[in-house]
């Protein structure tokens, strides 16, 4: 996968694109972030998104990301150090690759008849919150 984070100074936004490496370059996710987000709000939103992801995992009986989410929470509680905040966001990033959120949790949700919108809502909230924290740190 390829991540591109680009700041366009004229309109004060970050443009984040996530692409899969293949013959066809197809953007899987595209987000525009404010170049001056409130980092404390971003951290709060990420903590909430992690809690929702943990709740979904508990609902489906999957605990493969439990340590990742616990480590993310631990690091996000030390907001005096931006490196801890960044590492917390990266610990919460359970996307891409075999055995990732996109593979495991998506498949189990489908098997357990969890509504697609519920999985999508939790996934988008977590992914967006991670990106917002990263953009917030880059703008700090």
Go through the PLM ranges and name each one:
Residues 67, 71-140:
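Alpha-helical oligomerization segments
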Residues 4, 12, 17, 59, ...:
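Residue-identity detector for threonine
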Residues 2-11, 59, 97-98, 109:
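Proteins with a high burden of low-complexity, intrinsically disordered sequence enriched in S/T/G/P/A and R
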Residues 1-39:
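Extended, non-transmembrane interaction/recognition domains
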Residues 31-89:
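Conserved binding-pocket/active-site segment within a compact domain
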């Amino acid at each position: 996968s390829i991540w591109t984070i680009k700041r366009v100074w004229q309109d004060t936004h970050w443009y984040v694109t996530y692409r899969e490496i293949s013959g066809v370059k197809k953007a899987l996710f595209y987000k525009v972030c404010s170049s001056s987000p409130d980092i404390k709000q971003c951290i709060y939103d990420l903590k909430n998104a992690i809690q929702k992801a943990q709740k979904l995992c508990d609902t489906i009986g999957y605990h493969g990301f439990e340590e990742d989410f616990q480590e993310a929470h631990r690091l996000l509680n030390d907001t005096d150090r931006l490196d801890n905040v960044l590492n917390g966001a990266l610990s919460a990033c359970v996307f891409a690759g075999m055995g990732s959120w996109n593979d495991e949790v998506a498949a189990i949700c489908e098997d357990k008849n969890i509504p697609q919108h519920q999985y999508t809502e939790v996934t988008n909230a977590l992914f967006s919150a991670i990106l917002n924290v990263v953009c917030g740190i880059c703008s700090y």
